[in-house]
């Protein structure tokens, strides 16, 4: 209905342009919102106030001109001018009821649109280092990124979901060294484990698998490993210096081939686990993009040459720097260290050049909130590469804190392992985890109440919404038990019988659903859809508790059944976009 009114307004404004009441080149701002007070109609437009200055006309007088130029439409009973120049639209109840027919005919497609016009959008999300299992912090980014991608797709965008695999660099070398040291323990070697190594049980598991499948292929004596190493932190040394020395020793003792085998054993095991974990969470990707491939294909070197040719690279203290301050960053960034090694940022520059070259109309990065300071340097790099930095949208996700009732849950074990996404999912289920993760704006702090998420009460929002869907299904089971059948066509012809306050409220809410999906997609804001579904469920539960559906009056019964079936369909559609199931029984 909102789109229909926009079309009417646009026609009226074109008529005023033709009549000379508006400049011919006047941009047409269309802002139509639902009214909060029914006394002010169903929709209101502030178009006259926005155009008054350029039209050199009093807003109320211009509103009258617009109103007079509006084409007739059977859905609009009347229009009124209110306040400083609002145009209020009063709609025919029967016309509003047609949303029930639309929902029935469109089914799962109701709420989808073509506003994105097929624009290609890449959504990169999670992209956690493959150095350990995903934890609950990654879970929020996974749920948020997946829903944003699904919403954009529902709005007509061509969405490409991508995970950037950080399979190169120092952290991966530390993982490989950690796996190797645990492997040596399996071989019977006794040696201290680095203070800065990866200590999780998953490292022991990878090492045990390596020993079981490869025997002692990678064995070296503990004496050879420890020879010449600096002191670790417990001995008064520097843990960073120590772990770097261990990595270097691992590479030297194993040699390139065997080191790469150990490296890949750790990477492949953890990456397989991440893929499985996200798949079970309902999160899927079109592409898993390897950071290592950027170096192996020469993409990093090519990106650096492009920055140099644009005049944004200089040398200082033996290193190569990106002059990002010239493009708004707070300080310049190192691209190549004095030892000749490229930085993580250099790989990121190459990765974003790759994104630009793939021709996406929009690039959406979902990052942890701690990466906020990283945004200016990446935008600066895109600009220096000759790209359009405005194509990049960075969406920040705050960490989630777990509670059980009022008691805060310990987020990590003694060895520093975080509560994993899999542990959370096993406790509360995929549906609750997905729903709770997107209930609030992504950049807002989030308290995740495990006790609430597993409760079967109206206070649990996901249960409350799913229960509304199940309740509708139960009504249709009761219909079958009575030996009755719904006459869908008769119900559609008798929609005027839906005149109770609860019914009119539900009809108005159902007609809002496409607008909510569009808003949630364009604003990257899944919480709008969550709030809508909670409100719709509340309205339905109120209707369920106050009205009988299976009445003797066949016309009224079928009209009401069509209404609640429309509610069921919209709830199912909305939950589907959130990656949450719509159960028929609970």
UniProtKB/Swiss-Prot annotation:
Its EC number is 6.1.1.19. A motif ('HIGH' region) lies at residues 128-138. Keywords: Aminoacyl-tRNA synthetase, ATP-binding, Cytoplasm, Ligase, Nucleotide-binding, Protein biosynthesis. It catalyses: tRNA(Arg) + L-arginine + ATP = L-arginyl-tRNA(Arg) + AMP + diphosphate. GO terms for molecular function: arginine-tRNA ligase activity; ATP binding. GO terms for biological process: arginyl-tRNA aminoacylation. PROSITE patterns: AA_TRNA_LIGASE_I (PS00178). It holds the Pfam family DALR_1. One of its GO terms (cellular component) is cytoplasm. It comes from the Bacteria. It is found in: Cytoplasm. Transmembrane segments: none annotated. InterPro entries: aa-tRNA-synth_I_CS, Arg-tRNA-ligase, Arg-tRNA-synth_N, Arg-tRNA-synth_N_sf, ArgRS_core, DALR_anticod-bd, Rossmann-like_a/b/a_fold, tRNAsynth_Ia_anticodon-bd. Belongs to the class-I aminoacyl-tRNA synthetase family. Monomer. This is Arginine--tRNA ligase. It comes from Methylococcus capsulatus (strain ATCC 33009 / NCIMB 11132 / Bath). The lineage of its organism: Bacteria, Pseudomonadati, Pseudomonadota, Gammaproteobacteria, Methylococcales. The gene is argS.
């Amino acid at each position: 209905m909102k789109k229909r009114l926009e079309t009417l307004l646009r026609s009226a404004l074109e008529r005023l342009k033709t009549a000379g009441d508006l400049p011919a080149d006047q941009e047409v701002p269309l802002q139509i919102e639902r009214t909060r007070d029914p006394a002010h109609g169903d929709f209101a437009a502030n178009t006259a106030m926005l155009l008054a200055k350029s039209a050199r006309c009093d807003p109320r007088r211009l509103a009258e001109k617009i109103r007079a130029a509006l084409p007739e439409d059977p859905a609009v009973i009347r229009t009124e001018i209110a306040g400083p120049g609002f145009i209020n639209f009063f709609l025919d109840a029967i016309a509003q009821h047609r949303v029930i027919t639309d929902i029935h005919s469109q089914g799962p497609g109701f709420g989808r649109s073509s506003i994105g016009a097929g624009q290609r959008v890449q959504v990169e999300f999670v992209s956690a280092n493959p150095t350990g299992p995903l934890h609950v912090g990654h879970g929020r980014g996974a749920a948020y990124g997946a829903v944003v991608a699904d919403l954009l797709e529902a709005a007509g965008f061509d969405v490409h979901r991508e995970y950037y695999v950080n399979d190169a660099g120092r952290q991966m070398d530390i993982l490989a060294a950690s796996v190797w040291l645990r492997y040596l323990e399996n071989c019977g070697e006794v040696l201290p484990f680095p203070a800065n190594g990866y200590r999780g049980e998953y490292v022991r598991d990878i090492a045990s698998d390596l020993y079981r499948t490869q025997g002692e292929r990678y064995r070296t004596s503990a004496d050879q490993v420890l020879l010449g190493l600096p002191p670790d932190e417990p001995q008064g040394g520097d843990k960073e210096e120590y772990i770097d020395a261990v990595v270097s020793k691992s590479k030297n003792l194993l040699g390139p081939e065997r080191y790469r085998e150990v490296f890949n054993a750790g990477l492949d095991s953890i990456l397989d686990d991440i893929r499985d974990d996200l798949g079970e969470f309902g999160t899927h990707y079109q592409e898993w993009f390897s950071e290592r491939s950027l170096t192996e294909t020469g993409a990093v070197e090519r990106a650096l040459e492009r920055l140099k040719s644009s005049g944004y690279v200089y040398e200082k203290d033996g290193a190569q720097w990106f002059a990002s301050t010239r493009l708004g960053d707070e300080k310049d960034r190192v691209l190549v260290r004095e030892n000749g090694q490229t930085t993580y940022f250099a790989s990121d520059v190459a990765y974003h050049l790759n994104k630009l070259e793939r021709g996406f109309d929009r690039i959406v990065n979902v990052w942890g909130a701690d990466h906020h300071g990283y945004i200016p340097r990446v935008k600066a790099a895109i600009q220096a590469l000759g790209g359009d930095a405005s194509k990049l949208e960075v969406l920040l996700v705050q960490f989630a804190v777990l509670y059980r009732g009022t008691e805060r849950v310990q987020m990590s074990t003694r060895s520093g392992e975080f509560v994993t996404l899999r542990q959370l999912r096993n406790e509360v289920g995929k549906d609750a985890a997905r729903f709770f993760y997107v209930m609030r704006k992504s950049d807002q702090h989030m308290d995740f109440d495990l006790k609430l998420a597993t409760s079967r009460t109206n206070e649990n929002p996901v249960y409350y919404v799913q229960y509304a869907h199940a309740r509708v299904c139960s009504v249709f089971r009761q219909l079958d038990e009575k030996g009755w059948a719904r006459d869908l066509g008769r119900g559609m012809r008798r929609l005027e019988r839906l005149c109770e306050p609860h019914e009119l409220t539900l009809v108005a809410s159902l007609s809002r659903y496409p607008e909510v999906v569009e808003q949630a997609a364009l604003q990257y804001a899944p919480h709008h859809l969550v709030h809508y579904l909670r409100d719709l469920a509340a309205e339905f539960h109120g209707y369920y508790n106050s009205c009988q559906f299976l009445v003797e009056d066949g016309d009224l019964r079928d009209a009401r059944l069509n209404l609640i079936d429309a509610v069921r369909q919209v709830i199912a559609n909305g939950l589907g976009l959130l990656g949450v199931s719509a159960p028929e029984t609970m």
